[in-house]
């Protein structure tokens, strides 16, 4: 049953109906539409449209419908209803008769869908925050188990300075903390109810919209009806949150793909998150990580698409805004799936400590320590930087590590270098000296793990 039609003398072309209908995707708002309808029925009692007995009948029927939806949400798709609002109203009329036709009094699908979508977004934010925290917990536990796993840190994908696998894990804990805080900020701005704003000019019934907002679990009601039915900022914000979050997961995936490669060989991934080749029997491919990396693009695309949909729309509601849902649903589903998969990848990862240490000892990752040593001897840093660069060239010429050069070789670049330089160039010394907050020293990493555990567990 269409919720309109009196104005029309011809039925809609079936091709237009298929083009126009949205039930195939907005069926996901069924629970929110029913919850909003229950609250609206209560509001109609306060203005005399419904009496208490009528409201009870409607609420009971809606509660039964909610149970049916929760038991089998996909059954909705068998209907030819235009959208989820039409479907709910039709089902309600089936249960209570003409009384169901009174429920839409004073309400428009414009404020109805805006309310439904905000309720759905609130629930999704909670789900995403939980998944973010679970991944953070997995990272912290992996870090705690690998505090002694020394590995090279990279800039420009070249070995730069030694770090630990634990320190690498904690870097992503911080990124995810920002992701969670962005979700929380988004929630603060979307936590206002548009219900009662009608099509665009507000409802003609003196409904207490603040009370109505409270019944629905919103912090307050919106202030302007025209803005309320036009607003999709929360969709853009959530898509932005998802896009940034997926960038972080893509970087996480790329790091581990490299660490797992034969060239690095720092980690082994579990068989549970890898696959083989149909031709090459030896292959063990990091498919879970590659899919996380690959899915980043579709989320970015959803954000770009929604930006383009909204950029030229006049106030208030336009049918273009029906395009707000499919991209949002897919993007948040994708982000949630990738968060869960990233945690699964960490469950069973094996860090190959000897290989990590071997790599950290190569590539002259202790060169900065030699520069700092010279500074401590009174050499200006810029001059020390140049001296160490020359020493590295000599080490490369001899095919040796810096710490393997003879003292006489080092002293040809600076006479202040003495025997005390060799302990400074040791790998562990490179870590131990990074004692400032956020550094890679064992004490700082242990402190960061303890702080993260206190915050996340």
Swiss-Prot record:
Primary localization: cytoplasm
Reactions catalysed according to its record: 2-(N(omega)-L-arginino)succinate = fumarate + L-arginine
Any Gene Ontology CC annotation: cytosol
Superkingdom of origin organism: Bacteria
CDD domains on file: Argininosuccinate_lyase
Record GO terms (molecular function): argininosuccinate lyase activity
GO biological process: arginine biosynthetic process via ornithine; L-arginine biosynthetic process
Cross-referenced PROSITE patterns: FUMARATE_LYASES
Pfam family, one: Lyase_1
Keywords in alphabetical order: Amino-acid biosynthesis, Arginine biosynthesis, Cytoplasm, Lyase
Compartments it resides in: Cytoplasm
InterPro entries named among the record's database cross-references: Arg_succ_lyase_C, Argininosuccinate_lyase, Fumarase/histidase_N, Fumarate_lyase_CS, Fumarate_lyase_fam, Fumarate_lyase_N, L-Aspartase-like
Pathway: Amino-acid biosynthesis; L-arginine biosynthesis; L-arginine from L-ornithine and carbamoyl phosphate: step 3/3
Enzyme Commission number: 4.3.2.1
NCBIfam families to which the protein is assigned, alphabetical: argH (TIGR00838), PRK12308.1 (NF008964)
HAMAP family: Arg_succ_lyase
Family statement drawn from the similarity comment of this UniProt entry: Belongs to the lyase 1 family. Argininosuccinate lyase subfamily.
Name of the featured protein: Argininosuccinate lyase
